[in-house]
Amino acid sequence: MYKPQIAIIGSRELSPSSLSLLNALAHELVSQGYRMVTGGLGTLQQTVHEGAKSNPQHTDCDTIVLLPGFDPEPAIGHADVIIPTGLDAYRNALVVNAEVVVAIGGGAGTLSEMAFAWQFNRPIIAIGKDGWANQLAGESLDHRQSSKIIDCTSSSVEEIVSQISNQIMNQYKRHQGIS
């Protein structure tokens, strides 16, 4: 059975409040029948996995990690499905190949992922108070889309999940190639 995938991207190291938000979000996303995809490094992916696993409805394939290197070690014990791509930063395009992208914090890697998501016509939801996600919340990156990055930087977990569901149900269309 296919479950919609939600890419969660952001800083390797996040504040305690951001980690708490991610943990609760991952827990609730499992309840709603979603899978989560991360880039696999740092506390973000560990927190997403812990939040998902804390939900009694968690299955053994609810968290997917796409690692930049060939070594699976960084994600062992912190993900259900581990894919060591060996693609380095190029794997960012794979990470955001999801129905919706949720961005929190972020430096250059997150900015790259947000740009790919934008080019792929993926809805991007910005949460948290730091980094590129916060800076680009409510903005349009260029002319490719008439929409903007969805600003959920002050939203509750329930509001974020509602926005994710809304994007999937009403506005989502698959990328058909760069034009």
Task: Identify the meaning behind each predicted range.
Residues M1-P16, L25-H27, S31-Q32:
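Generic N-terminal amphipathic, Lys/Arg-enriched alpha-helix
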Residues A7-I8, T38, V65, A126:
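Structural beta-sheet core signal
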Residues N23-V30, G42-F120, G128-N134:
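Acidic/glycine-enriched connector segments
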Residues R35-T43:
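A short beta-strand-loop structural module common to alpha/beta enzyme folds
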Residues I82-G86, Q145-Q163:
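Short acidic-hydrophobic, aromatic-tinged amphipathic segments that line or gate anion-handling sites
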Residues I124-T153:
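Nucleotide-sugar donor-binding patch of glycosyltransferase catalytic domains
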Residues I168-S179:
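C-terminal amphipathic helix plus adjacent low-complexity
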